């Protein structure tokens, strides 16, 4: 329900997907221009989108509770506190320490924290603690977490699952690109908490497979990206269906005027916590702008990809991602592509291969720019510079997470330099700028670049051995003589494998 009047000028949202083609690349031709999308030539010299100033944050009428020093100081179920200990989570991050005392008390929360700052537990623990002990009816969840992408939905669900189990809450993930039948079954069986992308949740509601009138706690994670991706009409339509007077929590890495509509319309006397500067700067992150000649960029990219260690490389278009990935594989670099043109099972498999080290280079469009956490990732490379300072911050947010160190490297050709200077200024970042050439010490020192082996590689799915299942119907029955004779062979094989 609308709590305050809204301003129509904030209801106009940007169109298009974060994964849509945005120009050409040295690794692929220009993607077809979508309706309403500005024309760009060659993918170089593009003018960044003008940075939007942050809106005036709402004033808190009711005083907020002070931050806590430890989880034990919070009014949470003992099972949740025990689960935190078993997961090795002992000290709250700043955004958790600041918001949890208020969210646990049922206050609306507007929180800003950089990517990797611990936002998931900041809202997740409060939602689980306040929902614990309740039981959802079929198709009627009690808590809702809205996120912009499938990858972020899966990461949020994975992060919260052990805590949900500790308080006997059922959690369902509702996203596009996956079996809708399984999601329907999960909702029919009863799920107290649903993590969802707006489009698939709307589809399920339209089918009659989900209702939101019992949702008492609603979370919007990465609200600014949902606005940027054109999801605002769907998001507001969903929020209008949840229980009136319920708790709302909005978390994001940036809070610009695209989010103002949601704050004005759905948050009531919110507690505002901003634990990071507006630019999202991270002290453990280094920013490098590498000036390269256009003719040298292709080779420089290949040498960086051949480094020892993992790296995420961002390009603008799906076609460019596929072209670069094919080139790297032919050059002897274990690379995999990630973009919106891949099916969800393919994307999940690729991320697993990257996280486990089966592939060293993840070549991606902005589909990977949010919600993907990879431990010990120390390098992100913008092969194609982003056109928006928020995209830059969220691409870079894949490294230097949770106090770790990392570097963000952007390859810039001569005709891109002016635009890159503007973008960095909008992001509040002063990068280290270096002129580099392939094979030179500066490129090796900053990125670990080295010549690839030149021996083509093929990435295959890792073989996972599964234990043989014994048929339940054979219990208490005499096996045929042929089966009995084969039994020692199977036993011997299993023993050898062990």
Task: Describe each region flagged by the PLM.
Residues 1, 5-10, 18, 22, ...:
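General helical secondary-structure elements
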Residues 2, 430-498:
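Non-catalytic, charged low-complexity extensions flanking SF2 helicase motor domains
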Residues 1-98, 316, 497-498:
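N-terminal intrinsically disordered, low-complexity tails of helicases
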